[in-house]
Amino acid sequence: MTTQTSLAATFEDERYSWARTRGTRHRAVLAEAALLAVLVAATLTAATTDQGWTTAYFVAWTAGLLLFIPLHSLLNLGIRGVFDRGLHSLDEHQQGMREHSHARVGWPMTALTFAAWTGGIALAAGTGHTALALCLGFLLWFAAGLLPYWHLAWTLPDEAEEDPLAA
């Protein structure tokens, strides 16, 4: 039995069916991945300077994280929010999709989490920029947490159109 919450109702609302197309989901995944790659590159670039944390880096970091919010909202609408809803609001099929995506990206998630730790430690030890090391670790750990979202959005087929004459 599923319980309809206001969050679940938003994700199930047909006004957002445009976000559930495969092309839209693919573009959202690519945009999120590119955004995180740019933030990682900016972090590594800032770490090569003597100053480290600069105003320009802070602006890039803030703008990137603010841009992430609408991108992830779009992605979440495309996958009906199956990772952000409680189990009680998902049907068996949605629960299965969620579990399958987690299972498929388990090893890459572990590798990215390990890279977050080792990359952050190596950056701090090599450059002395602790704040940037924390940013790098956060970004890689964040990407690890996004892998199930990306996997589901990328592999989920387009939803079948309901035939109004079939009723």
What are the functions of these language-model segments?
Residues 1-36, 149-167:
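Cytosolic-side membrane-entry/anchor segment at the start of a transmembrane helix
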Residues 16-23, 48-55, 97, 126-129, ...:
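Juxtamembrane loop-transmembrane helix junctions in multi-pass integral membrane proteins
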Residues 37-47, 109-128:
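Alpha-helical transmembrane segments and their membrane-interface junctions
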Residues 49-77:
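Hydrophobic alpha-helical membrane-embedded segments
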Residues 56-61, 120-150:
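Hydrophobic alpha-helical transmembrane segments and immediately flanking/interface helices
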Residues 69-86, 151-156:
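Membrane-water interface of transmembrane alpha-helices
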Residues 80-90, 109-119, 162-166:
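Juxtamembrane/interfacial segments around transmembrane helices
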Residues 86-104:
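Short membrane-interface loop/juxtamembrane segments of multi-pass integral membrane proteins
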